[in-house]
Regions:
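Bacterial N-terminal signal peptides that target proteins for export
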Residues: 2-14
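Bacterial N-terminal signal peptides
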Residues: 11-24
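Short, contiguous pre-domain boundary segments
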Residues: 22-33, 178, 318
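Flexible, low-complexity segments enriched for small/polar residues
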Residues: 29-39, 44-58, 84-96, 100-106, ...
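A mature extracytoplasmic/lumenal domain signature
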Residues: 51, 63-66, 75, 237-239, ...
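N-terminal accessory alpha/beta regions
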Residues: 56-197, 201, 207-225, 246-250, ...
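Active-site substrate-binding loop specific to GH73 endo-beta-N-acetylglucosaminidase modules
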Residues: 146-149, 153-164, 169, 175-179, ...
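Surface-exposed interaction patches
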Residues: 193-194, 203, 217-218, 242-243, ...
Length: 597
């Protein structure tokens, strides 16, 4: 890009950002004279909310079925395989592997990892660079050239790293690529929208320890339960190795806990006639608490054990009740006690070990015994059962019904959820025992959702914007990693949001002159074929191959239409290059109207 082009794009972004930042929706009165009729406006609105952006095929399908029947079809469980999507995902070999296989194939041994981190720290210090962020996170945010230089420098210093350096990055990179491909090309779009919603709600950071190897299994857990009962989803998350490790509950114990208690439990392991020990179901073994086959005779590692409140706090504040849900610090402490001993087979409170079983286990000797008092309810001493009772208490609490309903209404209707709809959704949640599918039906069949009041009221996140641009333009994607890198550059690295809050679902998080410039740059690069492995055939050309205009391009890829102000601004910019077809596509994709859904 020349300096002149860069300056022109910056000026254009400044001219457009005020329109994107206007409060409230871009209602029908602001649209161009070519705006769609009311039935089509409803169709476009529904597709903007229940998919990652309308495609021409989606529009035809909804027009054929009708909006109500199409919504019902999206809410029904899928019955057929998406073979086209499976073909696209096939080259991403790590997506079909579980945590055990991933760790066996890709995990860098701790001593090698320490050498890498030390070398990077020394390099950054000598170059006077800030050390913000985890090393893996900084690596993910590098451009491809910087990554290549990083690898070459490490291998020159440590030749033995040649076959190891960067292997965990492959796992996360393929997770990101798979997420982009599913969102862009899956037939069942609402499944993908809900998978994204629940991962953000139950966020984990893939760069914390071995979590990167657990995320695939974790996301499958969320997908399988994304339309079911909320309590089932909550229990599955609580017992998932990814969440247990991310929020440190895997090492939460009774302060008086001693690993020796688990060595005694080893005696319960039956020794068969062939002399090979076989674990009895649910029997605890030394590896979980930091021991292992090679050090059982050694003294347990010296470590200060105790209760960790991280999961208990986020369980109530972020996963169920909400920050104003009626709990106090004493409840956090009691819940934390109840979840002591909820750990990971192969990790355990003694520290991560090379045993890679990576599945939930309950370590009874590490559990704080005695009754607990949570939200005014006495939870009787019962080991693992205490945690399950608390999850039931929270899943069925009125504050949870309202908090989850409010987040769903925010996702599908407006940043400031209409109270009446939240009330009705929460009532459905309570009546059905937390049936997510029925809560969604209440929201998606409501006047607030289907009516004109909240159309175009949501601003797309970087992930939604990039994927919707691919879908609207009909781009062919051979290299989804380049799209994931662009999403990361816009401030939303997939699976790499470190705080448990996830990414904010609100316009103010994503609107600025800088962000709109980044989006415009992406749109123009996409339409011009400057993204490696992503291409547009006949960009801007209509079926009859007539010379395109801004209006004809907008009608094809932005059916809701441009506002008169945007049309005027973009028309002036397009004429600078003689209405170049590719540039017309890029300008429409970068318009304020395309940033909204």
């Amino acid at each position: 890009m020349t300096r002149r082009e860069s300056r022109s794009r910056a000026i254009l972004s400044i001219a457009l950002v005020s329109q994107l930042a206007l409060p409230g929706p871009l209602g029908a009165t602001t649209l161009a004279p070519s705006q769609p009729p009311d039935d089509d406006a409803t169709t476009i609105h529904v597709l903007n909310r229940l998919t990652f952006g309308p495609s021409s095929a989606d529009l035809e399908k909804v027009r054929r079925l009708g909006v109500s029947e199409w919504i019902d079809a999206q809410l029904r469980p899928g019955t057929s395989a998406d073979t086209a999507l499976a073909t696209r995902l096939a080259p991403l070999v790590t997506l079909s592997m579980g945590a055990v296989e991933l760790r066996e194939k890709y995990e860098i041994p701790p001593n090698i990892r320490q050498q890498i981190q030390k070398a990077r720290a020394e390099r950054d210090a000598s170059a006077g660079k800030e050390g913000a962020g985890a090393p893996g996170e900084r690596y993910e945010q590098m451009d491809p050239k910087a990554r290549r230089e990083e690898r070459e420098a490490m291998v020159r210093r440590f030749p033995q790293l040649a076959t190891l350096l960067g292997t965990p990055q492959k796992v996360v990179a393929e997770l990101q690529a798979g997420k982009v491909l599913r969102a862009a090309f899956a037939e069942r779009q609402l499944d993908e929208v809900m998978a994204d919603f629940w991962f953000n709600h139950f966020n984990v950071f893939a760069r914390k320890g071995p979590v990167e190897f657990m995320v695939g299994d974790y996301e499958r857990t969320l997908r399988e339960r994304s339309f079911g009962k909320f309590e089932d989803l909550l229990v599955a998350v609580a017992q998932s190795p990814a969440m247990l490790f991310y929020l440190d509950n895997w090492q939460s114990t009774d302060p008086n806990f001693s690993p020796r208690d688990l060595y005694r439990a080893q005696a319960r392991t039956r020794m068969p006639a062939n002399g090979s020990p076989r674990r009895r179901p649910n029997a605890m073994v030394p590896e979980m608490m930091g021991g292992g086959a090679n050090n059982q005779a050694k003294q347990p590692p010296k470590r200060t054990f105790g209760i960790n409140e991280n999961y208990a706090r986020e369980l109530m504040e972020l996963h169920t009740l909400g920050v104003d849900g009626g709990y106090v610090q004493a409840d956090v402490v009691e819940v934390a006690k109840a979840f002591t001993g909820w750990t990971i087979l192969g990790e355990g409170p003694g520290g991560p070990r090379r045993n890679k079983e990576s599945r939930f286990a309950f370590a009874a000797p590490a559990h704080v015994k005695g009754d607990k008092r949570v939200l005014g309810v006495t939870i009787k001493d019962g080991g693992e059962k205490e945690g399950l009772e608390i999850l039931h208490l929270l899943a069925t609490h009125p504050s949870t019904a309202r908090f989850i309903s409010s987040k769903l209404v925010r996702r599908f209707v407006a940043d400031h959820p209409p109270e009446g709809l939240v009330d009705r959704a929460a009532a459905t949640f309570a009546k059905t025992g937390g049936d997510i599918r029925e809560v969604l039906r209440t929201i998606l069949k409501s006047e607030e959702f289907l009516g004109p009041a909240y159309r175009a009221a949501k601003v797309k996140t970087p992930f939604e914007f990039v994927v919707s641009a691919v879908r609207a333009s009909g781009a062919e994607v051979r290299n989804p990693q380049v799209l994931a890198q662009k999403i990361s550059a816009m401030g939303m690295p997939l699976y790499l949001q470190q705080p448990p809050t996830g990414y904010k679902d609100a316009a103010e998080e994503w609107i600025s002159t800088t962000s709109l410039l980044e989006r415009m740059n992406f749109a123009l690069d996409l339409s011009a074929g400057r993204l490696r492995g992503v291409s547009l055939k006949g960009a801007g050309r209509s079926a009859d191959n007539k010379a395109p205009t801004l209006d004809t391009v907008a009608a094809r890829i932005l059916p809701a239409g441009l506002s008169p102000k945007s049309r005027e601004t973009l028309e002036a910019e397009a004429q600078k290059d003689g209405n170049d077809p590719a540039k017309l596509v890029g300008l429409v994709l970068g318009s304020p109207e395309f940033q909204r859904r």
